[in-house]
Amino acid sequence: MITTRLHKLAIAILFTIPLTAHAGVFDIHVGGICSTNFGDTLGHWAGETSINAPIDQRDSMATATAQMAATLDTYCTGGNLCYVYVYSNGGAVMSRTLALNARAWNIGYVAAAASNEGGSELGGTGFIGEVFGGCALAGHIGTSDHRNGWNHNDTHGIITGMIAGNGWLAPFVQSAVLPGHDDGAVSEASAGGYTTTSGRSSICEAAPKYANHQAWFSCEYGSLNHLDMKLKMICNDGGLTTGCP
């Protein structure tokens, strides 16, 4: 699996961006469904600035996508370089933003934990409300909503590294609705970037994935549920050393 800290150095060289006072490296954090930001805990890397992106995922993907694009316009152009850390439905917001915009953002990679990019079979069910609390957008994040909503292969050539969990999440019974292995909210078909909703036993399974989507660090985290996974990618990438699952 990829060692992303070394990968960051290689990307900076590839972009030929001087990491001086005239340029910045920004680590953009994007939360999940029904959230308005990532939350209180962000990753921190020496010499880089962490951003708690103000993305409102309560009402519509259109609103969230517009706010995501505005965030990238602010931090990821000119001499700046960004790394984008997304959780849950934040993965779908980022994917949709790339697909619907032709802007030349300087993004080294997207790091996705428990991504709902491919939608959840729980979308529009009472289970979403039990797990995350109710919001209007929760009724529109199903597999057909997300998979048919935009071109997931249009990534501007940007890599999305993905990790997934397979742990139990209260109220537990919803896992019967999700195909294959799942973290209690999304299946590994979604969290692994696969092009179909067929059940998967890990995100390393050999099957078609959306362009530039990769499994990073582990084929799955068998004991971690959807909530546990939120900080796992940031921890794996060196942004947190305490409070890691």
Walk through the language-model features, giving the residues of each:
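Active-site catalytic motif of lipid deacylating hydrolases and related acyltransferases
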Residues: 23-82, 118-121, 128
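Short, solvent-exposed loop/turn segments at secondary-structure junctions
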Residues: 33-35, 91, 116-118, 167-170
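Serine-dependent carboxylesterase/thioesterase catalytic core
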Residues: 65-157
